[in-house]
């Protein structure tokens, strides 16, 4: 029981620390090359430089909360696409595991492999925290440092409405 308590305390500290130091609103998109679920390299800074893009972080593919978060965005895909939102999901999983996750749940967006924590570091966040970031023309305009699971798409759509008319 004592070990569980210590583990919970450490996780809470890491999560609160990552929220305190997270990428600030108005910051430019991180410039970093990343590996996609297709096994290709993507210049994330360039991908976020034009239009509206969502980057959402989830701790681990195939786990219940992460499935709910990704499937929420999948289910909101048509409405997000109607608003021309590009979506990128990030976890510490390998590109192969991300591809399995994408295929199993029919995810229509690109997943990024962050096995070394470089993407999380570029966003100044913990690898294990669930967060979401909206960029417009390469600038961070909205962030959710305690991103929802099953309500992720709804929260992003509300944020887009609040950021209108430029959405």
Regions found by a protein language model. Give the residues of each.
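Short, internal strand/loop/helix patches
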Residues: 88, 99-131
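Thiol-/selenol-based redox modules, centered on thioredoxin-like
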Residues: 133-167
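Bacterial N-terminal signal peptides
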Residues: 6-15
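N-terminal "domain-start" segment that seeds a small globular fold
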Residues: 16-45
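Short loop/turn microsegments at loop-to-beta-strand junctions
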Residues: 29-30, 52, 128-131
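Positively charged n-region of N-terminal signal peptides that target proteins for export
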Residues: 1-4
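Short active-site neighborhood of thiol/selenol oxidoreductases, capturing the structured segment around
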Residues: 44-67, 73
